[in-house]
C-alpha cells in the first residue's frame, strides 16, 4: 500500500536507532554522556589499548580501530588526489588569516570526503586517513638552520597565533555543529624549535621566563583559549630538566589549570619512550608510563608502545585506574565528537 511504501521510504531516509542496547550507541546523547557510558564497560587492558595512537578494534563493544595520526600541513597529506597548498611559511607571508581559513576549510572538506569514501566502500580507519589531524605547527622559527622551519608560520609569536587560529577553525569547523569536521592539534609543546638531531635528548634549561611566556607560549595559549583546539602535542625534549610529555608544569599547571584546556594531549612519536630511554628521568617503561600519564599525556604515539605497560603500572601502584579513566574519557569523548562511531549519514 501507499502507507507501507512511505513508511519504508522514511526508514531508508533516516538512520535507524534500533539495535542500540547501550547509551553510548545513541547519537542523540551528548558526546560526554556516551563516553561515560562506554568507559564503564571497558576493562583496564582495553583502556590501555585505546590510549595508543593506533588503537585496535574492540569488537565486543563495536569499537572500530582508530588512528590519531593524520597530517594536513598544507593540505590533506598522504591521501592521494587532493589539493596541495603552499608551505605554511609561504602562507604566513600573505598576512591573510581569512584566506588561510579558506585553505584549511577546503582541506578539511577533502579529508572528510576521503574518509567517508573509504568507510562507505568497506575500508577502515588508517594512519593518515583519519579524522584527527596533527596540524598546525605553531613553533617559532627562530633559527633558519632548523630543517623543519618551513612547517611554521615564522618567527613572530603574534602572527603565528593569528595564522594558527585560522588553521584550527578551518580544520575543525563551526563550534555549534553536531560534530567537528576534524580534530586539529597544536604542536610541539613547548619550546621546540630545533635543532632536529638533538630533539630526543635535549634539556632546555636556559630558557628565560620572559622568553618562554613572550615567545614560545603565546600561540599555544591563543589556540587553546580562542580557537578551541582539540589536541595539543607534547614535544620530545625536556624543559627545565623535565621531559615535556612528563612535565606537569606544562601539561597541567599551565595548559589545563591556567588556560582551561579540556581536551586531548597527545605525545610526539616516541616521546614517552624518551623519558626513560634517552632523558633517563624514569627507571623503566612502567615508571615512564605512570610519569607521562600523571603529568597529563592522554594518548601515546610510539613504535614500541610504552603505554602498553599501563596495567602493570596500576598493579604496581604507580597510577590508579581512576587516573587512567580520566584519559580514556577524554579520548572517547573526542571520538564521539567526531562522529567516528556513528552512521556517516548523520
Model-inferred region functions:
Residues 9-346:
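Glycoside hydrolase catalytic-domain context in secreted enzymes
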Residues 1-8:
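Bacterial N-terminal signal peptides
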Amino acid at each position: 500500500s501507499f502507507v507501507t511504501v512511505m513508511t519504508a521510504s522514511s526508514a531508508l531516509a533516516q538512520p535507524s536507532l534500533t539495535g542500540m542496547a547501550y547509551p553510548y550507541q545513541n547519537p542523540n546523547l551528548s558526546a560526554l554522556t556516551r563516553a561515560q557510558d562506554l568507559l564503564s564497560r571497558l576493562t583496564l587492558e582495553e583502556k590501555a589499548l585505546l590510549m595508543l595512537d593506533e588503537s585496535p578494534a574492540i569488537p565486543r563493544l563495536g569499537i572500530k580501530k582508530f588512528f590519531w595520526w593524520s597530517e594536513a600541513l598544507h593540505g590533506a597529506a598522504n591521501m592521494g588526489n587532493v589539493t596541495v597548498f603552499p608551505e605554511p611559511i609561504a602562507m604566513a607571508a600573505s598576512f591573510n588569516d581569512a584566506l588561510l581559513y579558506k585553505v584549511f576549510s577546503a582541506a578539511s572538506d577533502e579529508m572528510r570526503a576521503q574518509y567517508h569514501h573509504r568507510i562507505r566502500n568497506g575500508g577502515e580507519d588508517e594512519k593518515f586517513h583519519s579524522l584527527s589531524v596533527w596540524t598546525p605547527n605553531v613553533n617559532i622559527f627562530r633559527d633558519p638552520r632548523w630543517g623543519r622551519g618551513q612547517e611554521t608560520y615564522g618567527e613572530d609569536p603574534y602572527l603565528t597565533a593569528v595564522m594558527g587560529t585560522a588553521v584550527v577553525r578551518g580544520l575543525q569547523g563551526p563550534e555549534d555543529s553536531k560534530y567537528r569536521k576534524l580534530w586539529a592539534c597544536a604542536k610541539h609543546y613547548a619550546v621546540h624549535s630545533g635543532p632536529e638531531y638533538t630533539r630526543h635528548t635535549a634539556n632546555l634549561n636556559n630558557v628565560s621566563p620572559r622568553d618562554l611566556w613572550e615567545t614560545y607560549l603565546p600561540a599555544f595559549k591563543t589556540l587553546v583559549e580562542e580557537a578551541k583546539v582539540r589536541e595539543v602535542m607534547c614535544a620530545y625534549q625536556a624543559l627545565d630538566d623535565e621531559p615535556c610529555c612528563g612535565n606537569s608544569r606544562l601539561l597541567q599547571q599551565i595548559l589545563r589549570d591556567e588556560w582551561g584546556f579540556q581536551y586531548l594531549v597527545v605525545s610526539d612519536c616516541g616521546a614517552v619512550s624518551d623519558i626513560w630511554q634517552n632523558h633517563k628521568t624514569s627507571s623503566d617503561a612502567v615508571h615512564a608510563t605512570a610519569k607521562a600519564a600523571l603529568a597529563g599525556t592522554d594518548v601515546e604515539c610510539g613504535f614500541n608502545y610504552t603505554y602498553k605497560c599501563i596495567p602493570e603500572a596500576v598493579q604496581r601502584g604507580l597510577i590508579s585506574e581512576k587516573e587512567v579513566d580520566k584519559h580514556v574519557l577524554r579520548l572517547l569523548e573526542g571520538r564521539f565528537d567526531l562522529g567516528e562511531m556513528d552512521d556517516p549519514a548523520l
